[in-house]
Amino acid sequence: MTHTPQSGTAYRARLEARAGRLAGPTANLAPGHVQANLAILPADVAGDFLRFCQRNPKPCPLLAVSEPGDPALPSLGHDIDVRSDIPRYRVWRDGQLAGEPTDVRDLWRDDLVAFLIGCSFSFEEAMLDNGLPVRHIEQGCNVPMYRTSIPTEPAGPFRGPLVVSMRPLKAADAIRAIQVTSRFPSVHGAPVHLGDPAQIGIADINRPDYGDAVEIRPGEIPVFWACGVTPQSVVAAVRPKFCITHAPGHMLVTDLLNSRMAVL
């Protein structure tokens, strides 16, 4: 995959996160660059989690996997340190959220393996380029995300509900969004559901499980995409002894280009 010089906006964003000066959501940050979800697990369960991602490519499209104990990800960009280059992390112990630090270097171990998973923020650039509105960017907030009643395909101990992100669109725009996002299978691809949220187990569209609620205007329908926060719902269900993820909406900004993610 092609990536940009280290002097680009993506590298600067990582340095800002590393220095503790970037702590908010990364939507629309470093335009043109692929952003990634994160899951870090001990090596003894990493093989099962790899199979989980392979069996669930819509919510968990793998971009890279680190070597055990190695925080570098050279295939994704220059000088990446997965322990510090994300604005906010989540630390899980026995399936319970134990903290949201901005740096996990003090928690790093030689047996930890990092999984970087494609993020829908990449296809949002293509949506904007095609004149499609992205409401959470308009409102300056995080994308709304919901746990659903749709099961994932299990692998070893890893199983749990699919998490989806939502963007409200008019019907004609929703059709165009399907066409646009279908070109990006490595960053979740086409929607998994349109319309009635109750059909996928969402009781209240105005109360997302992650992120922020956004306005749904008259004439719009909710459009749902598989989401890379799915591993966090799986962590809650599986309750591994130790796990680190990104905080929802707080991604690793890579040097990879969104334009290189398209398949057509």
UniProtKB/Swiss-Prot annotation:
It comes from the Bacteria. The keyword Lyase applies. GO terms for molecular function: lyase activity. Gene3D superfamilies: PSTPO5379-like, PSTPO5379-like domain. Its EC number is 4.2.1.-. Keywords: Lyase. Belongs to the D-glutamate cyclase family. This is Putative hydro-lyase Bpet2233. It comes from Bordetella petrii (strain ATCC BAA-461 / DSM 12804 / CCUG 43448).
